[in-house]
């Protein structure tokens, strides 16, 4: 039910793929759609320290799942089954503050979210810390996802923003594409694409397949209620029945 584009054969981990077959492929179309959908991101004043994100920390994983949910529009419990936010006090009105130390980051059969957070942390540690800090800042906001997105929208030429702000903005886009396509698009590549695409409509971004495990977990085909070639979690004969509602796939 999940995975990469159906025409694509499994690709060796960490290989660069930039090959075109003809002028338009399904990957080109879906990648373009995902790049367009990837959010634009802005800033908060958080100091950056390399590798200060601990990928083995349950608290940091909770923040990463919340960040990913806000950016992709996919419910946290779909990204990480069993995910649950906990409060330090009994339920009240308004709700008590969230206690990250008691919250549950959830799991999935292949734990692909750990691959994604590890990849982002190794590539852009300060940017990932920046984004998780933004989630922490808005953790108890009544409309947390909207607050995160609103804080992450600005033009590249905004003079009030720093280079760190811009870097975090494009890292957020890379995280969106990781979840939807199970591939890594360098933030610098996405930034260059934004500038060059109007002049060169044939320009396509280079990317890396993250892992064979990730091949089966891309959300692009889940949203399309489909599955990648050679892998399916759906029961044989599912095509003879009407598809489930989209919310059964992505939550919400």
Question: Model-derived features: where do they sit?
Answer:
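N-terminal secretory signal peptides
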Residues: 1-24
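Solvent-exposed, polar/charged alpha-helical surfaces in well-ordered, non-transmembrane soluble domains
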Residues: 62-65, 69, 114, 173, ...
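N-terminal twin-arginine translocation
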Residues: 22-28, 38-56
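Immediate post-signal-peptide N-terminus of mature secreted/exported proteins
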Residues: 51-76
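Structured domain cores in non-transmembrane regions
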Residues: 75-169
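Sec-dependent signal peptide hydrophobic core
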Residues: 33-37
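Mature-region segments of soluble proteins
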Residues: 130-252
């Amino acid at each position: 039910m999940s995975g990469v584009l159906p025409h694509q054969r499994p690709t060796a981990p960490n290989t660069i793929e930039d090959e075109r077959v003809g002028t338009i492929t399904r990957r080109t179309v879906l990648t373009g759609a995902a790049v367009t959908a990837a959010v634009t991101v802005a800033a908060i004043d958080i100091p950056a320290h390399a590798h200060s994100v601990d990928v083995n920390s349950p608290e940091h994983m909770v923040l990463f799942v919340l960040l990913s949910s806000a950016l992709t529009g996919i419910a946290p419990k779909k990204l990480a089954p069993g995910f649950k936010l906990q409060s330090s006090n009994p339920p009240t009105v308004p709700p008590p503050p969230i206690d990250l130390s008691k919250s549950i980051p959830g799991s999935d059969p292949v734990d692909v979210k750990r691959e994604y957070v590890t990849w982002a942390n190794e590539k852009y540690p300060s940017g990932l810390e920046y984004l998780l800090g933004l989630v922490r800042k808005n953790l108890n906001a009544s409309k947390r996802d909207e607050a995160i997105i609103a804080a992450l929208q600005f033009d590249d030429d905004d003079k009030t923003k720093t280079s760190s702000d811009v870097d975090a903005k494009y890292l957020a886009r890379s995280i969106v594409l990781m979840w939807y396509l199970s591939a890594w698009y360098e933030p610098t590549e996405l930034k260059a694409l934004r500038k060059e695409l109007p002049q060169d409509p044939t320009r396509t971004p280079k990317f890396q397949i993250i892992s064979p495990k990730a091949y089966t977990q891309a959300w692009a085909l889940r949203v399309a209620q489909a599955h990648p070639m050679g892998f399916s979690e759906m029961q044989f004969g599912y095509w003879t029945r009407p598809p489930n509602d989209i919310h059964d796939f992505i939550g919400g």
